[in-house]
């Protein structure tokens, strides 16, 4: 059986290095969703339909709500209205096998059923009310402290007090 891929984000907060987040992607249970995220970490698919690189590098976490989650992945508009998957625009909810069990869970942000693109969130708490609505496709395996530091610049509205940017990203294994 193939091992699940591991990818990383090297984060900056307010222009200063904040450390690395390493995530395991559940290719075993959500292969399509995991592959989308993996390829967006490496940037290997080139330019998307919207004329922007299909790559998380340089994009921000535009919505951070303490005691809830940190959301990013909108590399086209940067504000939560955009994003694009490697499959075109949006793709289906693959399954809801994995649950939002606690801090470090990686899940797809969406605008309703079957509207997955490139936006994702990392939970900072158990968020079981999202089970069956958002596809869980990975987990943080190193750098949860970095997620906690990002959480500190969030607010109840989701606006961050300092820019939170994926300065670099890619695949480890």
Curated annotation (Swiss-Prot):
Its EC number is 5.2.1.8. GO terms for cellular component: chloroplast; cytosol; Golgi apparatus; mitochondrion; plasma membrane; plasmodesma. It is found in: Cytoplasm. SUPFAM superfamilies: Cyclophilin-like. PROSITE patterns: CSA_PPIASE_1, CSA_PPIASE_2. Binds cyclosporin A (CsA). CsA mediates some of its effects via an inhibitory action on PPIase. It catalyses: [protein]-peptidylproline (omega=180) = [protein]-peptidylproline (omega=0). Ubiquitous with higher levels in stems and flowers. In seeds, present in endosperm and embryo. One of its GO terms (molecular function) is peptidyl-prolyl cis-trans isomerase activity. It holds the Pfam family Pro_isomerase. Keywords: Chaperone, Cytoplasm, Isomerase, Rotamase. Disruption phenotype: Increased susceptibility to P.syringae infection. One of its GO terms (biological process) is protein folding. Its main location: cytoplasm. PPIases accelerate the folding of proteins. It catalyzes the cis-trans isomerization of proline imidic peptide bonds in oligopeptides. Involved in reactive oxygen species production in response to pathogen infection. Belongs to the cyclophilin-type PPIase family. Interacts with DEK3. This is Peptidyl-prolyl cis-trans isomerase CYP19-1. It comes from Arabidopsis thaliana (Mouse-ear cress). The lineage of its organism: Eukaryota, Viridiplantae, Streptophyta, Embryophyta, Tracheophyta. The gene is CYP19-1.
């Amino acid at each position: 059986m193939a091992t699940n891929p591991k990818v990383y984000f090297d984060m900056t907060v307010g222009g200063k290095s904040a450390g690395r987040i390493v995530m395991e992607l559940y290719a075993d249970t959500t292969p399509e969703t995991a592959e989308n995220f993996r390829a967006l970490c490496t940037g290997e698919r080139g330019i998307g339909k919207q004329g922007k690189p299909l790559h998380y590098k340089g994009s921000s976490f535009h919505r951070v709500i303490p005691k809830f989650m940190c959301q990013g992945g909108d590399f086209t508009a940067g504000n939560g209205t955009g994003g694009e998957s490697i499959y075109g625009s949006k793709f289906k909810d693959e399954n809801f096998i994995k649950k939002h069990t606690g801090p470090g869970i990686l899940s797809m942000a969406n605008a309703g059923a079957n509207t997955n693109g490139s936006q994702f969130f990392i939970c900072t708490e158990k968020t079981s009310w999202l089970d069956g609505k958002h596809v869980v496709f990975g987990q943080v395996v190193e750098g949860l402290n970095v997620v906690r530091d990002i959480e500190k610049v969030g607010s109840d509205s989701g606006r961050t007090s300092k820019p939170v940017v994926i300065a670099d990203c890619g695949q480890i294994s």
